[in-house]
């Protein structure tokens, strides 16, 4: 499939989506949001892909939503256009997704990064939800995912003031998984994605589902769901291979079945 605003590549069992609107600082217009979602969905159904990496340029991950596309909208226009419906489809991707962020990840860019399962940041990264400065509020999940990631007090601080935080503060707050030097960002992100992609495909998908369920259920419900997923791994070839390899003190050879 041909894309105009992103680049799609592969590295071993990793699908790589690179945001590519440099003239607009990777601002997320409706075309780009749809292309990111469509590419991720294509990679999600590819049996040879075990992880998806989303990244931008060294200077900017994504500077936010494309304000020029939204500025003149009426309520009816915004409601009918439903700019963010693509994000619901992206959230349904079952393959583990890793965001590799350098430079600015603001507004929709921060929200896109938070939709990923791991967020690896360069030491140059800056995060924020500055929508309040435009007379609006986060509209792509920022008020919900940011609060779950860093807690109410910190989320209120960022959303109500619109201030940005650097990579170190983002890591201390629990927003990012790890921080690396800018030159090491893509090698580190590829290494993490490759490690995940080499695990059992069904097991990583179930693990992602179990963790995500913890945000939407009681502890008792989450534990029951986890237990059922755990039991279901025992019908897979990968469970047999993984445990046999452990007993035999060798590396497992998963077939993703």
UniProtKB/Swiss-Prot annotation:
One GO BP annotation of this record: fatty acid beta-oxidation
Top EC class for this record: lyase
Annotated GO MF terms: enoyl-CoA hydratase activity
Gene for this chain: echA8
Function: Could possibly oxidize fatty acids using specific components.
Protein origin, superkingdom: Bacteria
Protein name as it appears in the record: Probable enoyl-CoA hydratase echA8
Record EC number: 4.2.1.17
Reactions catalysed, as given in the entry: a (3S)-3-hydroxyacyl-CoA = a (2E)-enoyl-CoA + H2O; a 4-saturated-(3S)-3-hydroxyacyl-CoA = a (3E)-enoyl-CoA + H2O
Keyword annotations from UniProtKB, A to Z: Fatty acid metabolism, Lipid metabolism, Lyase
InterPro entries linked to this entry: ClpP/crotonase-like_dom_sf (IPR029045), Enoyl-CoA_hyd/isom_CS (IPR018376), Enoyl-CoA_hydra/iso (IPR001753), Enoyl-CoA_hydra_C (IPR014748)
UniProt record similarity statement: Belongs to the enoyl-CoA hydratase/isomerase family.
Keyword match Lipid metabolism: yes
